[in-house]
Amino acid sequence: MSLINEKKDFKIIADLIPANSSVIDVGCNDGSLLEFLKEEKDINGRGMEIDQQKVQLCLSKGISVIEGDADLDLYDYPDNLFDYSILTYTLQATKSPKNVLSELVRISSKAIISFPNFGHWKIATSLLIKRKMPISEKLSYSWHETPNLHFCTINDFIDLCEEAGIRIEKQANLKTNRLNKFYGKNLLNSYFNAVSYTHLTLPTK
């Protein structure tokens, strides 16, 4: 991801989180988002990351982090331990997205999820014209090397939340930088105006 898109991405997430919130970033990578949220919102943050080298990088920055797997290790946390849980660009790489979502809204009051929207018009056009899986800045792996297991569209994600009994509160996207109250499925949002990543806030049941 480019630095410009990363800044826009972080800003959208920061706008969803009140100051001084307790936050867990699941799949926190090198801890850059937690650093940004600490600076902008003075959060009490901690991370979970499956890659040991990235865990060490977080620790070298003074970030509280544990080595863990979203599919296996969220069960260890008690209910409502955090104000917010964050899962950015990781949902599609989990083995059981439904279980992970359910755990995120169990351990926190609200969750913020971002994922590549496989229904975006550029992806659909690439599949239609080239008849090949798309490769881009946001989807940079060849199909046989990708860590991604479960691609989905925005509408697929909405259906999953309904099935899991999770309420979507707001949506945002990188193209407009706007936060919108969620009113249900929208063709423009899911195909024409949505970029490849969409952010959703899910309150607990």
Show where each model-derived region lies.
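Conserved alpha-helix/loop element of class I SAM-dependent methyltransferases that forms part
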Residues: 4-20
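Glycine-rich SAM-binding Motif I of class I
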Residues: 31-35
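Class I SAM-dependent methyltransferase SAM/SAH-binding core
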Residues: 36-64, 68-72
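A short SAM/SAH-binding and catalytic strip from SAM-dependent methyltransferases
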Residues: 84-95
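A short glycine-rich, Lys/Arg-flanked "PGG" loop and its adjoining helix->strand segment in the class I
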Residues: 99-110
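Conserved class I S-adenosyl-L-methionine
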Residues: 113-135
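Acceptor-substrate binding/catalytic loop of class I
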Residues: 140-155
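Conserved small/polar residues in nucleotide/adenosyl-binding loops
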Residues: 198-204
